[in-house]
């Protein structure tokens, strides 16, 4: 049983959904980033979704673009990212860790090499934002070879053909988009998602986590009531980091408070 399966089983037994925060590794700097990731887990995050800093994050709104720029300015390289992940993994043996990234970073040292490094660091899943299902074969093959779960996005406008491919190729969880467009807490999630969740279930897709525009506990509760296995929040988390750049201690306190409130909303 992989870590995602074990997590969803535990949460189901406890009548809870998953709360999964997203942060960019190395934002605002590698040392504080490590403290941030651990704080999120300690405050109740069920899993982590992590971005590797990239200079041209197409699917991201201004908040996460800012996080990428801060991490790159702090000299965060893929090597440093994997080192930080390995440290988080050593401290948290059961917490699923997912990467959400762009294909260029996977290609940089070869696809196999990338997934092998993921395996070594303790990564559970990889979602490549700019690779659709019909171009995913080399990535899926490498993921399977190294025991990594390939994650795919189910957009709200998806055809049955796309959803079938997402269900067949995806492992771990399905990233369910609450709306089209770029990431950002400024743009609210479009509920309801019942119909899309029902279609995913028909195709026997992995459990769905709802993302894009999730910034408050009521949305988490809504997502779980609609049938999602949980919710992912990125821009709202990164916004807290951005707001408290000059006060690292306050930054951690505010992140913990936000995570606790969001996690509380997952209790069915």
From Swiss-Prot:
According to the UniProt entry, its GO molecular function terms are:
tryptophan synthase activity
**Organism annotation:** Vibrio cholerae serotype O1 (strain ATCC 39315 / El Tor Inaba N16961)
Sorted alphabetically, the keyword list is:
Amino-acid biosynthesis, Aromatic amino acid biosynthesis, Lyase, Tryptophan biosynthesis
Under the subunit heading, UniProt states: Tetramer of two alpha and two beta chains.
Pathway entry: Amino-acid biosynthesis; L-tryptophan biosynthesis; L-tryptophan from chorismate: step 5/5
**Which family does the entry's similarity section mention?**
Belongs to the TrpA family.
Q: What is this protein called?
A: Tryptophan synthase alpha chain
Reactions this protein catalyses: (1S,2R)-1-C-(indol-3-yl)glycerol 3-phosphate + L-serine = D-glyceraldehyde 3-phosphate + L-tryptophan + H2O
Active-site residues (renumbered): 49, 60
The set of disulfide-linked cysteines is none
A GO biological process held by the record: L-tryptophan biosynthetic process
Domain of life of the native organism: Bacteria
| InterPro entries xrefs | Aldolase_TIM (IPR013785), RibuloseP-bd_barrel (IPR011060), Trp_synthase_alpha_AS (IPR018204), Trp_synthase_suA (IPR002028)
E.C. no? 4.2.1.20
Role, per record? The alpha subunit is responsible for the aldol cleavage of indoleglycerol phosphate to indole and glyceraldehyde 3-phosphate.
Which PROSITE patterns does the entry link to?
TRP_SYNTHASE_ALPHA
> Enzyme class, one word?
lyase
Q: Please tell me whether the keyword Amino-acid biosynthesis is annotated for this protein.
A: yes
Which GO cellular component term is one of those annotated? cytosol
């Amino acid at each position: 049983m992989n870590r995602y399966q074990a997590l969803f089983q535990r949460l189901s037994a406890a009548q809870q959904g998953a709360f999964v925060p997203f942060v960019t590794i190395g934002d605002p700097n590698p040392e504080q980033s490590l403290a941030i990731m651990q704080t999120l887990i300690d405050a109740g995050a069920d899993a982590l979704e992590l971005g590797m800093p990239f200079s041209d994050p197409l699917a991201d709104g201004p908040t996460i673009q800012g996080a990428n720029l801060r991490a790159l300015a702090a000299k965060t390289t893929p090597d440093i990212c994997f080192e930080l992940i390995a440290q988080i993994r050593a401290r948290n043996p059961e917490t699923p860790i997912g990467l959400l990234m762009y294909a260029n970073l996977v290609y940089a040292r070869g696809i196999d090499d990338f997934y092998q490094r993921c395996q070594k660091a303790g990564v559970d899943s990889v979602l490549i934002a700019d690779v659709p299902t019909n171009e995913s074969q080399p990535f899926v093959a490498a993921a399977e070879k190294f025991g990594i779960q390939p994650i795919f996005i189910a957009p709200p406008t998806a055809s049955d053909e796309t959803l079938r491919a997402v269900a067949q190729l995806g492992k771990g969880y399905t990233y369910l988009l609450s709306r089209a467009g770029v990431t950002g807490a400024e743009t609210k999630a479009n509920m309801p998602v019942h119909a899309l969740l029902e279609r995913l279930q028909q195709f026997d897709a992995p459990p769905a986590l709802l993302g894009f525009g999730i910034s408050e506990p009521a949305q988490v509760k809504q997502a779980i009531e609609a049938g999602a296995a949980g919710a992912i929040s990125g821009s709202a988390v990164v916004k807290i980091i951005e707001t408290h750049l000059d006060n690292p201690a306050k930054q951690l306190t505010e992140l913990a408070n936000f995570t606790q409130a969001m996690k509380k909303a997952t209790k069915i």
